[in-house]
Amino acid sequence: MGNGINKVLPDLYLGNFKDARDREQLARNNITHILSIHDTAAPILQEMTYLCIAAADSPTQNLIQHFRQSIAFIHQSRLKGEGCLVHCLAGVSRSVTLVVAYIMTVTTLGWQEALAAVKIARPCASPNTGFQNQLQEFQTGELQQFREWLKEEYKENPFNDEEDIRNLLTKASTEEDAELQNN
């Protein structure tokens, strides 16, 4: 139905609008929570738990204002052991920006490393320049406060997200080096 969802971390997936309607794909990945961010975001499947954010794919659209709510929604879903799909229309810009902000908050990675990891999991990932600037602004501004808030709010973090992301980056780098040597 859609292009297929991509697993970024355990119980965290990226996809597009069509993927968010694909019950078979959602069930296969134990997805019970959907974070929908696009112009006309609204709940579609009754059996899902939704966070819907109306936002345009425009460099001037402020996504930072939605980071805390999005991060909490994703984290709560994962803590329950339930999958969370984050999607916009194409699964390229808005949804990727929210997932990068989440990764930055649950790890020590900056926005560029977090985005590089997401691109490995979902090669079409490409936030518009305005969203990239907002991620950079988040990194130099509120990120540390968000990390502290997450620790205070949810106490223990049972995930190995930092290790998972660094392994993903290392694996991709090793594969790239091997490919260069073979050519």
UniProtKB/Swiss-Prot annotation:
GO biological process, one term: signal transduction
Active site: C88 (phosphocysteine intermediate)
Gene: dusp22b
Database matches in PROSITE patterns: TYR_PHOSPHATASE_2, TYR_PHOSPHATASE_DUAL
EC number annotated for this UniProt entry: 3.1.3.16, 3.1.3.48
Protein family according to the UniProt entry: Belongs to the protein-tyrosine phosphatase family. Non-receptor class dual specificity subfamily.
GO molecular function: protein serine/threonine phosphatase activity; protein tyrosine phosphatase activity
Protein name per Swiss-Prot or TrEMBL: Dual specificity protein phosphatase 22-B
Keywords (A to Z) from UniProt: Cytoplasm, Hydrolase, Nucleus, Protein phosphatase
Family matches, as SMART domains: DSPc (SM00195)
Signal peptide: none
Species the sequence originates in: Danio rerio
Top-level taxon: Eukaryota
Keyword Cell cycle appears in the UniProt entry: no
UniProt domain Tyrosine-protein phosphatase: residue ranges: 4-144
Recorded catalytic activity of this chain's protein: O-phospho-L-tyrosyl-[protein] + H2O = L-tyrosyl-[protein] + phosphate; O-phospho-L-seryl-[protein] + H2O = L-seryl-[protein] + phosphate; O-phospho-L-threonyl-[protein] + H2O = L-threonyl-[protein] + phosphate
Biological role stated in the UniProt entry: Activates the Jnk signaling pathway. Dephosphorylates and deactivates p38 and stress-activated protein kinase/c-Jun N-terminal kinase (SAPK/JNK).
GO cellular component terms attached to this protein's record: cytosol; nucleus
